[in-house]
Amino acid sequence: MVEIILSHLIFDQAYFSKVWPYMDSEYFESGPAKNTFKLIKSHVNEYHSVPSINALNVALENSSFTETEYSGVKTLISKLADSPEDHSWLVKETEKYVQQRAMFNATSKIIEIQTNAELPPEKRNKKMPDVGAIPDIMRQALSISFDSYVGHDWMDDYEARWLSYMNKARKVPFKLRILNKITKGGAETGTLNVLMAGVNVGKSLGLCSLAADYLQLGHNVLYISMEMAEEVCAKRIDANMLDVSLDDIDDGHISYAEYKGKMEKWREKSTLGRLIVKQYPTGGADANTFRSLLNELKLKKNFVPTIIIVDYLGICKSCRIRVYSENSYTTVKAIAEELRALAVETETVLWTAAQVGKQAWDSSDVNMSDIAESAGLPATADFMLAVIETEELAAAEQQLIKQIKSRYGDKNKWNKFLMGVQKGNQKWVEIEQDSTPTEVNEVAGSQQIQAEQNRYQRNESTRAQLDALANELKF
């Protein structure tokens, strides 16, 4: 097969154009074949054209090969000939050959890495990659394909583009109308979407509410928890879907018969999606861990999600940064990029959450600079919503939602809006509000002013207490 490939690289222009972008010297065994390919590649790189047999012989004469290497290449070049072959068959067989060689090389590399890792630390080859590189090596080998698609042609593909505008194939709608309005029909597959909130404001509540809504719309949801137990997450979904409060479940106010009846009623609905909840230790899983989980779920449960929820990004680990770093910008940005890449690969909508900084915990407004983890997160995310809850909003069972970033539309339209919240049921609900965003902003503004006044009063009270304590400590 090697002689056939090298021959057609020289004599078949159509074949060369098709396979050359995927060819590499590492796919040939050391010896005449690899050396001949290197001569071809050197000529192509220098002259941007396919070499002739004469050009190869001249390059061979000018090479620094040993006598044995020279003899082997000379013999192989003399065997290269223009023999007719079916183009489709030849391309397909070449693809198989390259895939097999890539897998062989990857397996050999993995064995080297594993063997090196098993040695005592002082005897290890420090230049050898860590075992953490093994998944990337294998994934790269498995991804090799002679795919002829080279991108979207703005002029030639305008019809398909228009159809995609009309059918919104990449959009996954929300149950809540206001979210559909600001995203123009829903979040898109292959995107990273983030909820921002302070401690105990409702990051997990928002994610659970979204999960329950997506379920009712018929989508499969994978909920990955990095802190809460699987049963705790499922209990929140129970409270939402079964219309019972968390207290009712915890205090035994609902019997097993009632619980079973409600669950079976949902089972009868043919439009209901599936939910899988999986917990990992805090800081103990990364995007590669989630890839493995997705593969297992597909094989063992025939489960392929449309929505992936990671609760939450800041307590995941990076699959690229293995050494602890105090540079949170680099680490969080890496995790965000890896999760977004996972969403693109799996064609899913990925939701996660982020913590706001301490300075914004009691604030009635939040902006991009208030993200606690890293400024690298908004640089990567496609859509970010801040969840704001003042004392007044909490008393009214409402939360103020603010668009921080949006690639779905102009974030300044409906930049802020109110959402009803039922904490006992872990649910966001629509509330009646005016059809224009300005009215919502005015309502939000009055609540913000009141909240700032309350916070000022609390700060003054705290300062007075500290002054009194300081006076008592004087000698």
Swiss-Prot record:
GO terms for molecular function: ATP binding; DNA binding; DNA helicase activity; hydrolase activity; single-stranded DNA helicase activity. ATP binds at residues 197-204. It comes from the Viruses. InterPro entries: DNA_helicase_DnaB-like_C (IPR007694), Helic_T4 (IPR046393), P-loop_NTPase (IPR027417). Its EC number is 3.6.4.-. ATP-dependent DNA helicase essential for viral DNA replication and recombination. The helicase moves 5' -> 3' on the lagging strand template, unwinding the DNA duplex ahead of the leading strand polymerase at the replication fork and generating ssDNA for both leading and lagging strand synthesis. Interaction with the primase allows the primase to initiate lagging strand synthesis and fully activates the helicase. Loaded by the helicase assembly factor on replication forks that begin at discrete replication origin sequences, as well as on forks that are created during recombination. This is DnaB-like replicative helicase. The gene is 41.
